[in-house]
């Protein structure tokens, strides 16, 4: 029977015995009888009590189990007593109020006598936990112990900005009140963590009736909540005085106005918030550590590491659990965040014979490895950038906006059930060389997914790639619930997203082409042998949209016998839907039949972002001129002279110089219209888009003004057919060339000693034709054309005979006369590599040869030394309009400005312009410095080349200034051996006056040395000599 019934029956027996004894005493009459009867009564009472007690003790007591103590005993007692405190604190959160001995246990693990509960230690086998209304006699020491009380359930944490009903703003900046950048950046990083911000907003009810106050200050949680609401509501920067004023409360050793470490402040701030939350409970000091770790801050930032120490002698494994709120990663041997995680969670060997094994009972060698037993909701990572002596490790650590820590989780079913995918929400960065100096900034995310940089009171948006390239110090990652709900599947190789955002995997080979047939291997693009396509196919970019145009390019370009990869190998090429029906060419590519409108509908996506890259060998076949007609498919180049059939209007004959070397067969014998067909040409001297295709730079031996020779003959092989277009644009361009040639001829009538400069329209050095070849009859079908025409049959020269010279006013063309056929090898100039400084004395000067001038920036041939300033060779007396026009063009000898594929100036041209601008500025600065150092000077007339003293004149020599200087140095008398002012030694020393003030050399060696120095300075300043200067220098040296 129950214990209560046994106790009640014993009480009834005792009461009956007392009544019986009292009733017997009242019936006695005399005193003696009363005394005797009293003794007997006492004895009988004792006998009755002893007999009943013995019977009760000998009786069998049966116990029955009741479902709840409240329902059986306490509920019956409530009817007799007034309940002051409802419920039992020991039974909150489903925990039983009994321990294994049957005693009532309080909420903090103590029994009623104040004795500590024996089952508190996690390794104690008698640990009792009752979550499901039944007893667990033992707990597994290899599992994480569960707290007896949960202060704040983990399920109440709201992860992500979308979980809150509040509309979150970007947030304002914080004013730096004096070396508080560490405080501002830490607060900004914390307030941009969604889980923490959602919890602080939920604390507004506590904010209304907060009675928690530490000595000397208020609640730090309320201060954080007010600061968060201030940054969300204000439009200007706020002053975090609520946190700044509690700096001593947060950490006692932090001093106001002194620079502090942001991570140290973060740790003290979180601990102060935890302490403020625990102060809401009266017996918070009696709570054990497991219960204290269930605060909201512990649930947000807290996690548990599983430490496994394995003995190398007996393989005994000791498992312990460690609570953490941030991970400190060593980056000395890591280049990325993944490498740092690998090093942190890898197995490491402990000190030899430094671990005492529980199985061996002795010190042995062991290994230790960490793993994640319970991952936190918000993962805080601190990179160890500072050493104990204050030095900073400033190496760049790369990281991604999303990280996966599933492989570092403990090998338990509970840990592996949930994927550990985190996304970056905020970070703290440090700028500076050490921890004692520098500046802290913060980066935070918003509900829209964008990131902002918080630099004290300044707030500005920042791109994602800039965030990942930031030199981070503290990073906050929050658990990604979207990835946890739908785990990311492993994508196979060769599969990528269609537009970079969709999660549907699409094979890369079928993104932009529905055609099932596809050639695998190296392929050549249509339109050029070096990899430049003329359609809308891309060279380096991935094309995501399907297009109707086709191109057989697949990403590998072949140019002049070698593979070329300009940027990255393209993943996909552009193929047309009708590719299967098109005829394949010799190299395995599909030819393009409807390519006439291939460049008029679409442009390549990334073609305006990449500049074409080619080597010197590939410059021979670099570009393709646009053509308004459909593509042609010629076969091998036809080496015949009569290939064009234009109309003739002038007695100009065209001579063909056939190359000696046999041209190679074109690897791509087809061509299409270029995408530059619609691009405007800014240079008026550049041929328009509808010009003759015989001037295609791809088929000629030059590109952008470069000349390429092989030995003594030009490799003029070509693979394009000659297509004649009699448009008005062509005639206008030719007329412009003839007008410029006529102006050049008029300006050079007085030039007697200049050798004929044989330079053609775009920087070529043509071959000299013989007199016999120049006497050939002119072709009656030849139209006016420029000085050179490049076609598949070679280089076409434009000459005229004496009869043409007689009718010069009617047709202005160039006369090229000279010795038998040969190609002069030009001398290279480092400033103008396309100019030739070798004097031509083979043939006499003729009026026609004198008028052969520069047309596109090439240099003139002359016997004189080239001018150093701009790389041109010209006569000092020549000031014609052609030279002025040339000076307005490109100054490096490239001819007309070379544009990129998108019609903009090339990067090389921009760099050259910048160099020229800087050189001019340096020259101006040097002139100003020389003018300032020179002081006041006497005026002097410049010496005439025909004067009597021309042979004795030195460039820049001023005898009057030398005389004044001589008087200045000899005003005190003395100077016994100084010669008179008109001695030549003064002229030799005048530019070295500041260096040799008191040393006037009189020997011939010193005079020669000083004269050479003066000549070098004169040339470097951009000066020149007259035509008879070499003879004058020779006389001076003698």
UniProtKB/Swiss-Prot annotation:
Any single Gene Ontology cellular-component annotation: nucleoplasm
Region (Disordered): 22-44, 107-148, 487-794, 818-881, 912-985, 1000-1038
Biased composition (Basic and acidic residues): 729-746, 912-923
Pfam families in UniProt: UCH
Bias (Acidic residues): 747-756
Post-translational modification Phosphoserine, affected residues: 513, 515, 672, 674, 747, 779, 785, 819, 843
Reactions catalysed, as given in the entry: Thiol-dependent hydrolysis of ester, thioester, amide, peptide and isopeptide bonds formed by the C-terminal Gly of ubiquitin (a 76-residue protein attached to proteins as an intracellular targeting signal)
Main location: nucleus
Ranges annotated as biased composition (Low complexity): 502-517, 546-559, 587-606, 766-776, 942-953
UniProt biased composition (Pro residues): 777-786
Cellular compartments annotated: Nucleus, Nucleolus; Cytoplasm
Bilayer-spanning residue ranges: none
Consequence of gene loss (knockout): Mutants are lethal at larval stages. They are significantly smaller without gross morphological defects and die 5 days after egg laying. Cells show accumulation of ubiquitinated proteins in both the nucleus and the cytoplasm, forming dense dots. Double mutants for ref(2)P and scny die 96 hours after egg laying. RNAi-mediated knockdown is also larval lethal. RNAi-mediated knockdown in the fat body or gut of uninfected adults, results in a significant increase in the expression of the antimicrobial peptide genes Dpt, AttA and puc.
Top-rank EC class of the record's enzyme: hydrolase
Active site, renumbered: 181, 439
GO molecular-function terms, A-Z: cysteine-type deubiquitinase activity; K63-linked deubiquitinase activity
Tree of life domain: Eukaryota
Bias (Polar residues): 23-44, 629-641, 703-728, 832-844, 859-881
Residue intervals of the USP domain: 172-480
UniProt family annotation: Belongs to the peptidase C19 family.
Name this polypeptide is given: Ubiquitin carboxyl-terminal hydrolase 36
Species in which this protein is naturally found: Drosophila melanogaster
């Amino acid at each position: 029977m129950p214990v209560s019934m046994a106790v009640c029956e014993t009480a009834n027996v005792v009461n009956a015995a007392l009544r019986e004894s009292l009733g017997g005493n009242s019936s006695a009459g005399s005193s003696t009888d009363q005394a005797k009867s009293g003794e007997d009564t006492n004895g009988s009472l004792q006998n009755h009590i002893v007999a009943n007690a013995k019977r009760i003790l000998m009786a069998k007591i049966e116990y029955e189990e009741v479902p709840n103590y409240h329902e059986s005993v306490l509920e019956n007692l409530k009817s007799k007593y007034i309940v002051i405190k409802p419920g039992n604190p020991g039974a909150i959160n489903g925990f039983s109020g009994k321990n294994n001995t049957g005693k009532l246990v309080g909420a903090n693990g103590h029994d009623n006598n104040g004795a500590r509960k024996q089952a508190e230690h996690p390794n104690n086998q008698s640990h009792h936990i009752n979550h499901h209304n039944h007893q667990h006699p033992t707990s597994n020491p290899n599992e994480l112990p569960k707290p007896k009380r949960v202060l704040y359930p983990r399920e109440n944490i709201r992860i992500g900005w979308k979980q809150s009903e509040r509309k979150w703003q970007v947030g304002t900046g914080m004013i730096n009140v004096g070396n508080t950048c560490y405080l501002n950046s830490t607060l900004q990083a914390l307030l941009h963590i969604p889980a923490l911000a959602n919890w602080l907003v939920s604390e507004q009810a506590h904010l209304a009736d907060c009675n928690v106050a530490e000595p000397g200050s208020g609640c730090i949680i309320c201060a954080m909540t007010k600061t968060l609401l201030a940054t969300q509501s204000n439009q200007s920067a706020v002053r975090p005085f609520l946190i700044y004023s509690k700096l001593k409360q947060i950490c006692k050793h932090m001093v106001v106005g002194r620079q502090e470490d942001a991570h140290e402040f973060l740790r003290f701030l979180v601990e102060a918030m935890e302490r403020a939350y625990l102060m809401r409970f009266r017996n918070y000091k009696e709570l054990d550590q497991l219960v204290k770790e269930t605060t909201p801050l512990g649930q947000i930032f807290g996690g548990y590491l599983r430490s496994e120490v394995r003995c190398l002698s007996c393989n005994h494994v000791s498992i312990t659990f460690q609570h953490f709120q941030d991970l400190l990663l060593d980056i000395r041997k890591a280049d990325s965040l993944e490498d740092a995680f690998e090093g942190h969670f890898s197995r490491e060997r402990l000190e030899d014979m430094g671990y005492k094994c529980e199985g061996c009972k002795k010190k042995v060698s062991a290994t230790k490895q960490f793993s994640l037993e319970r991952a936190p909701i918000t993962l805080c990572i601190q990179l160890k950038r500072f050493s104990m002596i204050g030095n900073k490790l400033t190496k760049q650590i790369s990281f991604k906006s999303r990280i996966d820590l599933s492989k570092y989780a403990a090998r338990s079913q509970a840990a592996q059930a949930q994927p550990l995918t985190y996304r970056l929400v905020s970070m703290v960065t440090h700028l500076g060389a050490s921890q004692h100096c520098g500046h802290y900034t913060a980066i935070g995310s918003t509900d829209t997914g964008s990131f902002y940089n918080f630099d004290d009171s300044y707030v500005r948006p920042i791109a994602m790639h800039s965030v990942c390239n930031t030199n981070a110090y503290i990073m906050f990652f929050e658990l990604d619930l979207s990835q946890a709900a739908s785990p990311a599947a492993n994508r196979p190789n060769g599969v990528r997203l269609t537009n970079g955002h969709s999660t549907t995997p699409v094979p890369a080979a079928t993104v932009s082409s529905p055609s099932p047939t596809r050639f695998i291997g190296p392929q050549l693009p249509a339109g050029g042998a070096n990899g430049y396509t003329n359609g809308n196919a891309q060279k380096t970019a991935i094309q995501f949209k399907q297009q109707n145009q086709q191109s057989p390019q697949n990403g590998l370009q072949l140019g002049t016998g070698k593979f070329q990869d300009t940027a990255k190998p393209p993943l996909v090429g552009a193929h047309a839907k009708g590719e299967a029906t098109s005829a394949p060419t010799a190299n395995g590519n599909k030819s393009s039949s409807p390519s006439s409108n291939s460049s008029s509908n679409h442009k390549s996506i990334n073609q305006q972002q990449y500049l074409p890259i080619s080597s010197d060998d590939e410059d021979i076949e670099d570009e393709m001129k646009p053509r308004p007609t459909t593509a042609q498919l010629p076969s091998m180049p036809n080496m015949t002279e009569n290939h064009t059939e234009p109309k003739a209007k002038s007695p100009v004959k065209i001579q063909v110089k056939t190359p000696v070397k046999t041209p190679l067969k074109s690897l791509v014998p087809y061509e299409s219209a270029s995408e530059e067909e619609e691009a405007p040409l800014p240079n008026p001297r550049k041929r328009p888009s509808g010009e003759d295709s015989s001037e295609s730079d791809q088929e000629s031996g030059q590109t952008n003004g470069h000349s390429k020779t092989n030995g003594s003959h030009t490799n003029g092989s070509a693979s394009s057919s000659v297509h004649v277009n009699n448009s008005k644009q062509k005639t206008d361009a030719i007329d412009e060339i003839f007008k410029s040639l006529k102006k050049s001829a008029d300006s050079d009538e007085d030039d007697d000693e200049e050798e004929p400069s044989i330079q053609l329209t775009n920087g070529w050095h043509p071959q000299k034709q013989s007199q016999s070849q120049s006497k050939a009859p002119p072709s009656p079908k030849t139209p006016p054309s420029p000085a050179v025409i490049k076609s598949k049959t070679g280089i076409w020269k434009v000459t005229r005979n004496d009869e043409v010279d007689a009718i010069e006013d009617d047709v202005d063309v160039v006369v090229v006369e000279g010795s038998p056929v040969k190609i002069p090898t030009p001398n290279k100039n480092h400033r103008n590599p396309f100019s030739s400084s070798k004097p031509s004395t083979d043939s006499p000067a003729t009026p026609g040869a004198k008028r052969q001038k520069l047309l596109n920036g090439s240099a003139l041939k002359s016997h004189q030394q080239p001018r150093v300033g701009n790389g041109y060779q010209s006569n000092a007396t020549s000031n014609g309009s052609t030279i002025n026009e040339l000076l307005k063009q490109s100054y490096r000898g490239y001819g007309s400005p070379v544009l990129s594929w998108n019609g903009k100036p090339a990067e090389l041209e921009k760099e050259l312009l910048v160099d020229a601008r800087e050189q001019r500025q340096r020259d101006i600065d040097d002139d100003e410095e020389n003018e300032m150092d020179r002081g006041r000077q006497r005026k002097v007339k410049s010496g005439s080349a025909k004067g009597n003293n021309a042979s004795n004149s030195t460039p820049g020599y001023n005898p009057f200034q030398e005389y004044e200087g001589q008087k200045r140095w000899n005003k005190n008398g003395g100077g016994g051996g100084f010669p008179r002012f008109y001695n030549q030694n003064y002229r030799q020393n005048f530019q070295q006056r500041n260096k040799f003030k008191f040393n006037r050399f009189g020997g011939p060696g010193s005079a020669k040395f000083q004269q050479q120095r003066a000549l070098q300075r004169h040339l470097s300043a951009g000066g020149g000599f007259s035509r008879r200067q070499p003879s004058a220098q020779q006389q001076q040296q003698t």
